[in-house]
Amino acid sequence: MKYIFDFDDVLFNNTKQFKEHIYKCLEKAGISRTVAETYYTEVREKEFSLKNFISTLLKRGKIDKKMEDIYEEIMSECPNFINNELLDEIERLGKNNCYLVTYGGKEFQQDKLDRSGVSIYFSQTYVVTESKNEIISMICASHKDEQVVFFDDKPKFLNDVSLKDCPNLVPIQYKEDLDFRELVREKTLHNLEMARRR
């Protein structure tokens, strides 16, 4: 069995913790949370660059601080936002069985991956700026005789992959309060039962 994991809000506590950390660092630099949140809603659907985000906010606020210093203060804390419980499970599964496929701005996502130190637990890591479909399909095709379990917190990415094209794919919506082992066991047994009925 092979496993594909998303990064943000699966392996990396992005929304509840890291984003809060970003806002606190910006406030410390003199950028109000309201201004930062408002601007974030304008740019979040595009390929996000934290460096550009900080630079624009500094420029708009006429704040004389170095973007690089604020960026470094934010990014240096990346290891503190890892879902260590899930990372332990990934380590148990083995590097050769695990892939990481994440959506976002390439430079920013890659920097989060590098600074958090998680890449060493995966046979391959992919940063995509559009659909995950192509990469997921490629992984499924490479392991067509095995089940490929795909964890993502966002239904749009889970639903993006055609089960007709990837019959060995088991998509699972990840929620932080669920027991990982139990989730895999239940979903895998359910899919095996469905396959027997066909």
PLM features: what roles do these ranges have?
Residues 28-31, 41-74:
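A metal-dependent, Asp-based hydrolase signature
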Residues 114, 119-150, 154-198:
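Asp-based, Mg2+/Mn2+-dependent phosphohydrolase catalytic module
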Residues 1-2, 96-97, 145-148:
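Short coil/turn segments at beta-strand junctions that form active-site/ligand-binding loops
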Residues 91-99, 103-127:
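Substrate-recognition/cap helix-loop segment adjacent to the acidic, metal-dependent catalytic center
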Residues 11, 98, 150-151:
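Conserved SAM-binding loop
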Residues 1-38:
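Active-site neighborhood of HAD-like aspartate-dependent phosphohydrolases
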